[in-house]
């Protein structure tokens, strides 16, 4: 390999090492938590949890509703 290629590889490696060393996991998690997708997922999760809690707390409403009886077919 010639010296120019080795120099480029060295510089790129140093840039990558600098990025990895400056990476903070806490800021990454904070950025993910504030993202639009995370907000949508949290809202959907809260809605599902609320629905589940309502079903668990008031199961008599579901039991009071009679199940539809299938009509017998005539031949």
Swiss-Prot record:
Residue ranges the record marks as coiled coil: none
Signal sequence range: 1-22
Entry annotated with the keyword Iron: no
Keyword Zinc-finger belongs to the record: no
Entry GO terms, CC: extracellular region
Tissue expression: Expressed by the venom gland.
Annotated compartments: Secreted
Domain of life: Eukaryota
Main location: secreted
UniProtKB keywords: Antimicrobial, Cleavage on pair of basic residues, Secreted, Signal
Function in brief: Antimicrobial peptide.
Entry text on domains: Amphipathic and cationic peptide with an alpha-helical structure.
Family: Belongs to the non-disulfide-bridged peptide (NDBP) superfamily. Long chain multifunctional peptide (group 2) family.
This protein's name: Antimicrobial peptide Meucin-49-1
Native source species: Mesobuthus eupeus (Lesser Asian scorpion)
